[in-house]
Regions:
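Short alpha-helical segments enriched in small residues
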Residues: 1-140
């Protein structure tokens, strides 16, 4: 990102900003914004900018969220993590649910689906690793 002089912004819904922090660590001043929000709030907010995530698959939602944060921040690259948890959310290593990752620029997008999601520390670590892997592969 720095080498290509590109900027990046991030949206995440269940990881409490840890993905944004990890990306900011390597992107430095090329990191624009990190946005964290729950489904209901972000859906209403996005409508004000003519983005709609209603009636879409989770993969489509992650792409729309990446496009949204890219547009909102005027970044070169938008990245989104959209996690859906199932089961007891108080468990530290939930490992259940679904994670959807998307990265977009002006012309390309790439997604990744992982059959694991949660709010515990191990879950967040898995989300960070999947995020960094997708970003690295996208930038190749």
């Amino acid at each position: 990102i720095i080498k290509n002089n590109q900027t990046i912004s991030v949206f995440e819904n269940i990881s409490s900003g840890v993905i944004s922090n990890s990306i900011k660590d390597f992107a430095k001043n090329n990191f624009n914004i990190g946005l964290t929000s729950g489904d209901k709030n972000i859906s209403e907010f996005m409508k004000k900018y003519n983005f709609n995530i209603s009636n879409k698959t989770p993969e489509q939602i992650s792409i729309e969220l990446a496009k949204f944060v890219r547009t909102l921040s005027s970044s070169d690259i938008g990245f989104a993590y959209y996690g859906i948890t199932t089961g007891d959310e108080n468990v530290q290593n939930l490992g259940q649910g679904e994670s959807y990752f998307a990265i977009v620029d002006g012309t390309n997008n790439r997604t990744k689906h992982v059959r694991s999601a949660g709010i515990g520390i191990p879950d967040k670590r898995r989300a960070i690793m999947s995020s960094l892997s997708l970003i690295r592969n996208f930038l190749k």
